[in-house]
């Protein structure tokens, strides 16, 4: 009814590093090099919203939406992205598109020309994904320029302002994913759930997780039940994103679960106590974390093979197929057989 799950690029099955932190170019490169020194493999690096200018004049509103590099932190974006690619790392940037494209943005002159905006009055390009002209400007004048610099895919973090009968996040996921399919390695985005059919635009994520045992306790259930609506490639902030207390046992157990989750994406907030670098923990915890992160990359051939099977072989859930059977009968009947329960 809603379509199959697409094939992910192979690199998406590896370890993701993400943190809400104002990295400078040197800090980020040193971090990635430290992972290599520690023999911890990474496939994807994610720069949260501080990659772009956030401290903007009050007349433009908030700094959550942005598309212009913060050159105080990243003075030469092309060089940074090339250096990351030289290290075999894919890069994703975080975007909050709700506030449109405003006059302080580097891309604004191109956008204003395409949309016929009054530049002298700093007329903004209001976010409207229902408008084909805005979508064209959004991709061609803003995102394509950044992709040309080396951005591999986009993290669509949030979208407010529902219009009409359709959530704009659904449109963002649809058009962003379809656009990303132009890449030779296949389409990929990271975004929140926007309703039934969202599994067609992987990867999804659950939003900010609280650092607590209760939160970890919920994640296996949440991840498994995402498949009930077809969301195979579901992720969450492994280790927790915010609040909570420093707890090495919690971090260890969470990472162990995360490595066997569909997507292994470490993420945390700006707090200096929440970061997930394995070498920041005790020797015992660090050793375990490194072991499991290495294991994830050893599993990639197995995961990729099963991903292909997921796409090629579609199966009716057994509970729906044999509704008259009770769950115990079904479990006994399907024991040791590959089947969706």
What label would you give each PLM region?
Residues 1-341:
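Catalytic-domain carbohydrate-binding cleft regions of carbohydrate-active enzymes
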């Amino acid at each position: 009814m809603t379509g199959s799950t697409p094939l992910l690029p192979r690199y998406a099955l590896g370890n993701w590093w993400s943190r809400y932190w104002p990295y400078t170019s040197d800090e980020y490169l040193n971090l990635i090099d430290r992972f290599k020194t520690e023999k911890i493999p990474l496939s994807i690096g994610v720069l949260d919203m501080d990659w772009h200018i956030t401290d903007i004049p009050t007349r433009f509103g908030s700094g959550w939406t942005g598309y212009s590099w913060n050159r105080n932190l990243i003075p030469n974006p092309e060089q940074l992205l090339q250096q990351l690619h030289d290290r075999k790392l894919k890069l994703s940037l975080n975007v909050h598109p709700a506030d449109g494209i405003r006059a302080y943005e580097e891309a604004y002159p191109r956008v204003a020309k395409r949309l016929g905006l009054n530049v002298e009055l700093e007329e903004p390009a209001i976010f409207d994904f229902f408008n084909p002209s805005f979508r064209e400007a959004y991709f061609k004048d803003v995102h394509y320029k950044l992709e040309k610099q080396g951005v591999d895919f986009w993290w669509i973090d949030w979208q407010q302002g529902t219009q009409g009968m359709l959530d704009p996040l659904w449109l963002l996921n649809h058009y962003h994913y379809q656009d990303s399919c132009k890449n030779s390695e296949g389409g990929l985005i990271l975004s929140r759930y926007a309703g039934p059919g969202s599994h067609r635009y992987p990867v999804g994520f659950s939003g900010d997780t609280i650092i607590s045992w209760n939160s970890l306790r919920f994640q296996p259930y949440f991840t498994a039940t995402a498949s009930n609506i077809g969301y195979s490639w579901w992720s969450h902030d492994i280790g927790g994103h915010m609040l909570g207390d420093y707890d090495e046992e919690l971090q260890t157990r969470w990472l162990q679960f995360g490595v066997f989750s569909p997507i292994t994406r470490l993420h945390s907030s700006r707090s200096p106590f929440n970061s997930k670098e394995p070498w920041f923990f005790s020797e015992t915890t660090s050793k375990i974390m490194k072991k499991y992160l290495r294991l994830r990359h050893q599993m990639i051939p197995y995961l990729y093979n099963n991903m292909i099977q997921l796409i090629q072989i579609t199966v009716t859930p057994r509970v729906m197929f044999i509704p008259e059977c009770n769950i115990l009968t079904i479990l006994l009947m399907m024991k040791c057989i590959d089947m969706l329960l």
